[in-house]
């Protein structure tokens, strides 16, 4: 293909009358006429802010606007059916679709757990500034609105390497979770802050083999369900090089 042209088909403050998926389906022919050969879509799954979420506060990767969760069925961009229709319309006009995906973290846990942690220096994440202690944190994800459809995997504190909120203490800090996979962080591409594994929310621990398997299963399901042509992986400098 000569001169392939990819358009970022979203922005942070999108608020037009048509939701984004409907707009994309309507504009597919026009985009092709302008020479666009690919579109980059925002995260299509449910974030912790439900229908208001931009998509980078990942809650449920399997909820593409299908289930009543986080106070909404659809996402900010529309329903699962509208998403699939937009992809189909773009494909009819020979336009590829890239899905934005956040594997780095999850947000909006459903249940509290008691978690062993150590505080770290926010400017140097390799420096512990406390001994081990226990907090209560929103680290259990059961996705009650989905009720096990597509995946019965339950995320708990063993799936995460760090968090930033202690519910019982009502305290915000960076807490390194102490689990069977290590007391600190994973090796990641970025050495900012000493080690930039932790970015925000519940930081996913790729040292856990069950986590790796679940994300691979999700990728297979997503390709089969949506027909997208590829992924743009968000926040890669914060993700384990071994997983990448």
Language-model segments: residues:
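Substrate-binding/active-site clefts of carbohydrate-active enzymes
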Residues: 3-26, 33-37, 41-82, 86-221, ...
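Short strand->helix junction
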Residues: 14, 236-238
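Short catalytic-loop micro-motif centered on adjacent basic/acidic residues
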Residues: 98, 230-236
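Extended hydrophobic/aromatic segments used for targeting, binding, or gating
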Residues: 239-244
């Amino acid at each position: 293909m000569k001169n392939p042209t990819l358009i970022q088909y979203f922005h942070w403050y999108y608020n037009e009358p048509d939701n984004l998926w409907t707009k994309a389906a309507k504009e597919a022919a026009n985009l092709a006429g302008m020479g666009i050969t690919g579109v980059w879509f925002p995260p299509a799954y449910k974030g912790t802010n439900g229908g208001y979420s931009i998509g980078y506060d990942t809650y449920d990767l399997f909820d593409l606007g299908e289930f009543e969760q986080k106070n909404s069925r659809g996402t900010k961009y529309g329903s699962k059916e509208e998403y699939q229709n937009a992809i189909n319309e773009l494909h009819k006009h020979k336009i590829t679709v890239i899905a934005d995906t956040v594997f780095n973290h999850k947000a909006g846990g459903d249940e509290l757990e008691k978690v062993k942690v150590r505080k770290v220096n926010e400017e140097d994440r390799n420096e512990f500034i406390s001994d081990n202690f226990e907090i209560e944190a929103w680290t259990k994800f059961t996705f009650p609105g989905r009720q096990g459809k597509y995946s019965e995997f339950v995320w708990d504190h063993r799936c995460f390497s760090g968090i930033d909120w202690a519910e019982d203490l009502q305290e915000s800090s960076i807490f390194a979770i102490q689990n069977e996979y290590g007391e600190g962080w994973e090796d990641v591409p970025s050495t900012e802050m000493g080690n930039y594994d932790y970015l925000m929310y519940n930081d996913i621990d790729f040292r856990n083999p069950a986590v790796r398997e679940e994300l691979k299963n999700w990728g297979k399901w997503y390709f089969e369900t949506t027909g997208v042509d590829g992924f743009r992986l968000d926040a890669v400098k914060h993700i384990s090089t071994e997983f990448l």
